[in-house]
């Protein structure tokens, strides 16, 4: 029988919530084999047109500083086929809070790679996609079956699949659902979906611990990228109107600002932008915001709300990105929160429930209904995540350069 150990207490009006640990963390091989025999992956498809792209593919590698990654022959070659993002920053250390941020718009104080579960009243990008029936899926290399929730696989020996590199499995609003876990699949299903033209419009792809450079090095990861991504970019079904982001969860040196090598490729990139660079300040939160702006989706009301949009998307919406002075930006630690080991706080951050946000479509109804009447914990309109209590990134300077034809009086 599965048992749950309560880690945190939920007090609804104060936005306090629960985190739980279950025996799903360490299933037996027999339990895995039994589940694998019956687990059915689910591959919904949709065709919702976007402003700048119709499909987004997010591929993450691991733990490499900008400079070594930029020197890798395979990565630098691919970057020249698209747009090199020279000021893309990860959010924190270690790995797991970055993956969490990519799905939930926040780290919730996470500063560890423990087996954590985020309560079901916290929304994710899955909720945003569902507002317009946009298909989504994750593809995790070497995960034993769709919806697997164990901490790792195989159970012994070298790591291959690890839960900490799987964004949506961290959220109970996903894992407690009857269908959503089946959309978190392995690479076998990826190639099946590719063959049968049943890939979703949003994909998050995680190679195993060998291929992502975590347990090896950037040369191994670069070789994997060449084997995996280069053929896909020649596949018309995969690449047509698709935008592919290749980035890293975090840098390797914790004392560095956490700028990570990132580039965009794919059929959605106009010819005149191929082989160019983009110096705009971006974070992992920028991707959540850009997805919302591209498809006309609401915001999570968290750090995605004020995040800069990918320039390709901003140019389509008319949004003016912030110019950020990155000389003192150090996105290498998190703030107090219920997921923190070193700076624990029982209070969960309250998101914004008002405002248009950078994507321009307001806050998701599920977020507004959950947190109605509560004051947001942070200044989520800022393009730079900062925390006054801990002093993280307080005082970072940013400004906008507005070009107005007639009048700027209506611009805020």
UniProtKB/Swiss-Prot annotation:
One Pfam family it belongs to: Phosphoesterase
Q: PTM comment for this protein?
A: The N-terminus is blocked.
Q: Which gene encodes it?
A: PHOA
Q: Which InterPro entries match?
A: Alkaline_phosphatase_core_sf, Phosphoesterase
Q: What GO molecular-function term can you cite, just one?
A: acid phosphatase activity
Provide the E.C. number(s) assigned to this enzyme.
3.1.3.2
PANTHER family reported in the protein's UniProt record: NON-SPECIFIC PHOSPHOLIPASE C4-RELATED (PTHR31956), PHOSPHATASE, PUTATIVE (AFU_ORTHOLOGUE AFUA_4G03660)-RELATED (PTHR31956:SF23)
Keyword Nucleus applies: no
Keywords from UniProt, A to Z, are: Glycoprotein, Hydrolase, Secreted, Signal
According to the UniProt record, one GO cellular component term is: extracellular region
- Where is the protein localized? Secreted
The region annotated as signal peptide is: 1-19
Spell out the reaction equation it catalyses: a phosphate monoester + H2O = an alcohol + phosphate
Active-site residues annotated for this sequence: 215 (proton donor)
Coiled coil regions, renumbered to chain: none
> Sugar-bearing residues?
74, 121, 186, 208, 217, 332, 343
Q: What are the GO BP annotations of this UniProt entry? A: phospholipid catabolic process
Protein name from the UniProt record: Phosphate-repressible acid phosphatase
Q: Which domain of life is it from?
A: Eukaryota
């Amino acid at each position: 029988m599965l048992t749950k150990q309560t880690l945190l207490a939920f007090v609804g009006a104060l936005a306090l919530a629960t985190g739980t640990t279950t025996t799903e963390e360490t299933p037996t091989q027999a339990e895995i084999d039994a589940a694998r025999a019956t687990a059915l992956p689910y591959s919904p498809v949709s065709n919702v047109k976007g402003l700048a792209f119709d499909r987004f593919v997010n591929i993450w590698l691991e733990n490499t500083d900008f400079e070594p990654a930029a020197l890798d022959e395979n990565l630098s070659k691919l970057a020249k086929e698209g747009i090199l993002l020279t000021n893309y920053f990860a959010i924190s250390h270690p790995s797991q809070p970055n993956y969490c941020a990519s799905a939930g718009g926040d780290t919730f104080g996470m500063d560890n790679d423990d087996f954590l579960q985020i309560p079901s009243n916290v929304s994710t990008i899955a909720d945003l996609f569902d507002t317009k029936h946009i298909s989504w899926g994750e593809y995790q290399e070497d995960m034993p079956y769709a919806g697997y929730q164990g901490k790792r696989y195989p159970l012994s020996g070298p790591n291959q699949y690890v839960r900490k590199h799987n964004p949506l499995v961290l959220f109970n609003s996903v894992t407690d659902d009857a269908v959503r876990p089946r959309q978190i699949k392995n690479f076998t299903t990826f190639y099946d979906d590719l063959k049968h033209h049943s890939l979703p419009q949003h994909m998050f792809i995680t190679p195993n611990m060998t291929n992502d450079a975590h347990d090896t090095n950037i040369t191994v990861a670069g070789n994997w990228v060449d084997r995996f991504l280069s053929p896909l970019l020649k596949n018309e079904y995969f690449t047509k109107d698709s935008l592919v982001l290749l980035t890293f969860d975090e840098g390797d040196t914790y004392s560095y600002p956490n700028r990570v090598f990132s580039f965009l490729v794919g059929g959605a990139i106009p010819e005149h932008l191929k082989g160019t660079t983009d110096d705009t300040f971006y974070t992992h939160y920028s991707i959540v915001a850009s997805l919302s702006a591209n498809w006309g989706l609401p915001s999570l009301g968290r750090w995605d709300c004020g995040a800069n949009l990918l320039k390709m998307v901003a140019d389509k919406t008319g949004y003016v990105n912030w110019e950020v002075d990155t000389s003192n930006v150090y996105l290498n630690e998190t703030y107090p929160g219920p997921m923190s080991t070193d700076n624990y706080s029982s209070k969960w951050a309250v998101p914004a429930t008002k405002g248009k946000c950078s994507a321009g479509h307001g806050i998701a109804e599920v977020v507004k209904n959950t947190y109605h009447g509560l004051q947001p914990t942070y200044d989520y309109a800022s393009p730079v995540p900062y925390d006054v209590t801990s002093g993280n990134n307080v005082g970072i300077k940013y400004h906008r350069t507005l070009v107005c034809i007639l009048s700027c009086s209506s611009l805020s």
